[in-house]
Swiss-Prot record:
Gene from which the chain derives: nth
SMART domains: ENDO3c (SM00478), FES (SM00525)
UniProt organism field: Rickettsia typhi (strain ATCC VR-144 / Wilmington)
UniProt-recorded name of the protein: Endonuclease III
Binding site residues for [4Fe-4S] cluster: 187, 194, 197, 203
HhH domain residues: 108-127
Length: 212
């Protein structure tokens, strides 16, 4: 896809939603990290339902450790993979306290050392907390990017690299959120709402399916 078309797409995203934000509800840097860990293979809505109560009291690494793994499980048991997530969160709390004075590191290599933190989670944290121009590729971003024509790769890592190359840096602070929101509400997996899509005239899928 040509650079001028990519810019046009993100100009439209920016005009319609100048300051997109994560749908995850959090109180501080640490609670965002926990929320993102919990969001793996879970919806933001389901995560917010449990963290609403969890974060009222337990919103620091020290407090989560005091709660303990079994106590944490009771709060998050409605979320998929809650057993492994509880174990990872407790282990991450221990590392944060021991190595980072209970703060969240602003370095990708340090973040992915934390149990339960993979490439996507680290990129979300760096983007949301530190406004770094990262590209977290979840299922929405992966699908939308390929459908629009922004990327062609068959893995999330390849798509991430393609997006970082093709998207102008001035858009990267918000690009992840725009693509997620577009995938969640417009460019849905089974039935994309192409007729009401603001970027359809630039979308390869729409052009090939409806405009040809």
């Amino acid at each position: 896809m040509q650079a001028q078309i990519v810019n046009k797409i993100f100009e439209i995203f920016s005009k319609n939603n100048p300051k997109p934000q994560t749908a995850l509800i959090y109180k501080n840097d640490f609670t965002l990290l926990v929320a993102v860990i919990l969001s793996a293979r879970a919806t933001d809505i389901s995560v917010n339902l449990v963290t609403k109560h969890l974060f009222e009291t337990y919103n620091t690494p020290e407090k989560i450790l005091a709660l303990g793994e079994e106590g944490l499980k009771k709060y998050i048991k409605s979320i998929g993979l809650f057993n492994s997530k509880a174990k990872n969160i407790i282990a991450s709390c221990q590392i944060l306290i021991k190595n980072y004075q209970a703060s969240i590191p602003n370095d990708f290599k340090e973040l992915v050392k934390l149990p339960g933190v993979g490439r996507k989670t680290a990129n979300v944290v760096l983007n949301c907390l530190f406004a770094m121009p990262t590209m977290a590729v979840d299922t929405h971003v992966f699908r939308v990017s390929k459908r629009i024509g922004l990327a062609k790769g068959n893995t999330t890592v390849i798509v991430e690299k393609e997006l970082l190359q093709i998207i102008d840096e001035k858009w990267l602070t918000h690009a992840h959120h725009w693509l997620v929101l577009h995938g969640r509400y417009i460019c849905k997996a089974r039935k994309p709402s192409c007729r009401i899509c603001h970027i359809k005239e630039y979308c390869e899928y729409y052009i090939n399916t409806f405009a040809s």
